[in-house]
């Protein structure tokens, strides 16, 4: 299994259990998330509760919770939305911090294509949700989520150059 960690913080953000598609010249990875239900496990042990005097409301009060699989699996923490100025400020800092961690070839590729990816994200800014890794480190990468037209499940966007592949 492969896990993808934030290159700046070491937080686990993704794994190969969630296939990705490269967009914006490979700078962004697009990953489909899904809403899943956790809790409220209904175990059928073969007993007939009505014959035993039991009702539907008997037993443990177990609450089902809907979560997004990627957010739950990697314990992503949602952040307040950014306005355009805040986003541009974040991107400048992120580009500077990430570029310092990349080798020369990756750095050149990143700097060549990051402007297009930034414009792509700016075009979706009002529709994006922002997430950081579990450590909630300020200088780490962001994970973006949005809903495509008519979709009920979110699509996540990752900066590919900001991820480090780790074999587990």
Curated annotation (Swiss-Prot):
Coiled coil: none annotated. Keywords: Calcium, Cytoplasm. GO terms for molecular function: calcium ion binding. It is found in: Cytoplasm. SUPFAM superfamilies: Mss4-like (SSF51316). InterPro entries: Mss4-like_sf (IPR011057), Mss4/transl-control_tumour (IPR011323), TCTP (IPR034737), Translation_control_tumour_CS (IPR018103), Translational_control_tumour_p (IPR018105). One of its GO terms (cellular component) is cytoplasm. Its main location: cytoplasm. It holds the Pfam family TCTP. It comes from the Eukaryota. Transmembrane segments: none annotated. Residues 1-168 form the TCTP domain. Involved in calcium binding and microtubule stabilization. Belongs to the TCTP family. This is Translationally-controlled tumor protein homolog. It comes from Oryza sativa subsp. japonica.
């Amino acid at each position: 299994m492969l896990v993808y960690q934030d290159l700046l913080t070491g937080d686990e953000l993704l794994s190969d259990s969630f296939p990705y598609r490269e967009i914006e010249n490979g700078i962004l990875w697009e990953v489909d998330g899904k809403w899943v239900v956790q809790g409220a496990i209904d175990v059928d042990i073969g007993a007939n509760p009505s014959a035993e005097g039991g009702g539907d409301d008997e037993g443990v009060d177990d609450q089902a919770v809907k979560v997004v699989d990627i957010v739950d699996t990697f314990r992503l923490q949602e952040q307040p939305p950014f306005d355009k100025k805040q986003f541009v400020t974040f991107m400048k800092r992120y580009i500077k911090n990430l570029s310092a961690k990349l080798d020369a070839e990756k750095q050149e590729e990143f700097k060549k294509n990051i402007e297009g990816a930034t414009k792509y994200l700016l075009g979706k800014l009002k529709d994006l949700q922002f997430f950081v890794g579990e450590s909630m480190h300020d200088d780490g990468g962001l994970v973006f989520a949005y809903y495509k037209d008519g979709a009920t499940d979110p699509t996540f966007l990752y900066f590919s150059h900001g991820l480090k592949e780790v074999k587990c």
